[in-house]
């Protein structure tokens, strides 16, 4: 079988896959911070809060993209391990066209239910104009956003991690260029920020389409290949829906946290919005290194190379925990200075710095959860994937939030995620220990 991965140099191959993913996501962090910076320069708390309230909308669109992006790439990686090139073409084409259709349907539904959804997000009379402007553009651009997460996942599973990074960086650079023009110079505020985001995604989508059409050896977007078997559909949805649940739970987390912060004022929601964006520095580095292992985990599982997989799992866990501890220390020690880059109000700086520290205290536990979640997704383990998808930012978080708020009031809102991280990491390690066919010796 003609392997697409160099398994003789396992760690080098892992970093070859992971580093472009990390770099691409770090550019995404730069964009998010730039976006936040330009919005925060308005010194308009209602504007900052209004845009922050719409964060779950973006996460929800990501979730729908990941149903077919992560679900499809997980299956494709295993098919590549089995040297089934015909199957990879069919699955990739199916995922592309179903995702496009999903994006169009979502756009229509989001516009139809715009007002009630904005109410659920927590928009008030003060923040509604800004939230509605941002939300409307995101809704119209839903197909472009959903497709972007399909493309970036699919090209990585064929080993084109660098090309995936180029696509992500290209769209983000366009986004960053447009931000100051549309937000400040043209004066479109929240709507301008959203337009910049969607235009960036459109440009990235066009690049990925060209890449799949001209450069891919195994993937396809030909309509004639848009069909899968019942078993393949079950595998795509089994992994993809659990991956999407993780994103949807993240949206629910933000909504619930904002609802609990609402009695304390819009300044608390605005500060949390900024702190969450800054904490993404650590989170997305961990996501990048975790996602870098997906093609390898899926390939090794499909090729039944269990000893090599166990070696890679041990290495990745050690590496991720180490880098998480370092990033956590850096962000904690510089929390005030980082908040000061975005706002000058002393009260908001102090509030945001405390929020940021709580967001990253347990980054090492988050790294363990991320890696084991993608491991279960890559190997098609639906039940463990499902349990982890609804734990850290779902059921476990909501329980932690209710209990912590009851015991510590405002401080409980801030510490809930840290408590959920510790409990969910314990669950993840327990599930790994129970997954004999992944960790068993050959």
Regions found by a protein language model. Give the residues of each.
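Helix-terminus/linker motif at the lipid-water interface of multi-pass membrane proteins
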Residues: 26, 30-49, 118-125, 181-188, ...
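N-terminal transmembrane alpha-helices
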Residues: 6-37, 41-43, 56-71, 75, ...
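Short alpha-helical transmembrane segments in multi-pass integral membrane proteins
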Residues: 1-18, 76-143, 185-241, 297-362, ...
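Hydrophobic transmembrane alpha-helices of multi-pass small-molecule transporters
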Residues: 60, 175-180, 205-209, 281-284, ...
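Residue-level signal for transmembrane alpha-helical positions in Major Facilitator Superfamily
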Residues: 15, 30-31, 68, 109-113, ...
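Short runs within selected transmembrane alpha-helices of multi-pass transporters and secretion channels
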Residues: 69, 137-156, 164-172, 193-206, ...
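Transmembrane helical elements of multi-pass membrane transporters/channels
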Residues: 16-35, 137, 171, 200-204, ...
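Small-residue-rich hydrophobic transmembrane alpha-helices
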Residues: 48-108, 145-164, 271-329, 333-335, ...
């Amino acid at each position: 079988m003609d392997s697409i991965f160099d398994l003789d140099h396992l760690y080098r191959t892992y970093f070859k896959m992971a580093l472009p993913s990390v770099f691409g996501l770090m550019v995404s962090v730069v964009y998010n911070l730039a976006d936040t910076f330009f919005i925060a320069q308005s010194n308009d708390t209602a504007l900052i809060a209004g845009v922050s309230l719409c964060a779950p909308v973006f996460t929800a669109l990501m979730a729908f993209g990941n149903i077919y992006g992560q679900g499809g790439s997980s299956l494709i990686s295993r098919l590549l391990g089995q040297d089934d090139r015909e199957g990879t073409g069919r699955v990739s084409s199916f995922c592309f066209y179903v995702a496009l259709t999903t994006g169009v349907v979502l756009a229509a539904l989001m516009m139809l239910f715009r007002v009630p959804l904005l109410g659920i997000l927590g928009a008030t009379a003060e923040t509604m104009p800004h939230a509605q402007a941002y939300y409307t553009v995101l809704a119209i651009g839903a197909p472009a956003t959903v497709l972007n997460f399909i493309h970036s996942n699919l090209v990585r599973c064929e080993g084109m991690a660098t090309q995936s990074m180029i696509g992500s960086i290209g769209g983000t650079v366009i986004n960053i260029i447009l931000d100051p023009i549309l937000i400040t110079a043209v004066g479109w505020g929240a709507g301008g920020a959203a337009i910049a985001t969607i235009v960036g995604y459109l440009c990235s989508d066009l690049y990925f389409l060209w890449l799949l059409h001209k450069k891919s050896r195994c993937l396809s977007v030909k309509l004639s290949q848009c069909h899968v078997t019942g078993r393949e559909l079950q595998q795509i949805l089994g992994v993809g829906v659990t991956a999407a649940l993780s994103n949807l739970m993240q949206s629910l987390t933000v909504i619930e946290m904002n609802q609990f912060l609402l009695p304390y004022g819009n300044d608390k929601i605005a500060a949390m919005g900024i702190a969450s964006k800054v904490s993404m520095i650590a989170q997305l580095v961990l996501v990048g290194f975790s996602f870098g292992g997906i093609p390898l985990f899926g390939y090794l599982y499909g090729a039944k190379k269990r000893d090599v997989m166990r070696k890679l799992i041990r290495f990745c866990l050690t590496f991720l925990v180490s880098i998480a501890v370092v990033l956590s220390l850096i962000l904690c020690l510089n929390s005030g200075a980082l908040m000061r880059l975005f706002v000058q109000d002393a009260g908001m700086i102090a509030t945001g710095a405390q929020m940021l520290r709580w967001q990253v205290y347990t980054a090492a536990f988050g790294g363990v959860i991320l890696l084991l979640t993608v491991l279960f997704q890559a190997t098609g383990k639906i039940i463990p994937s499902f349990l982890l998808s609804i734990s850290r930012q779902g059921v476990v978080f909501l329980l932690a939030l209710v209990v912590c708020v009851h015991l510590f009031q405002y401080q409980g809102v801030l510490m809930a995620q840290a408590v959920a991280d510790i409990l969910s990491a314990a669950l993840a390690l327990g599930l790994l220990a129970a997954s004999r066919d992944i960790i068993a010796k050959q």
